[in-house]
């Protein structure tokens, strides 16, 4: 079973994403910010991370840069899930090591397509 770490400071977004991912047969873990997410990745690296941009403690971009700098051999796919929709944000995320980008709010079909594009669904 594929695993996914949902990283978002919104409990509502985490709940919706969890429901969608579980219907797609993913094992799901959650983190409320980038710092907590890094800790979870050190314990058990997921196959994919759904990542919010703006969070307290550590932003999604900070998390992504640190994750990629650590150079683990089992790097997860990273899909940014955010309301930031301008080209500068999208380009910055991809340059920092994100694999895909999805806009909030998202539905099951959209998320499933993005997960297929990165090779985990």
Predicted regions: what they are:
Residues 15-23:
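Charged docking surfaces used in two-component/phosphorelay signaling
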Residues 44-50:
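Active-site beta3 strand of CheY-like receiver
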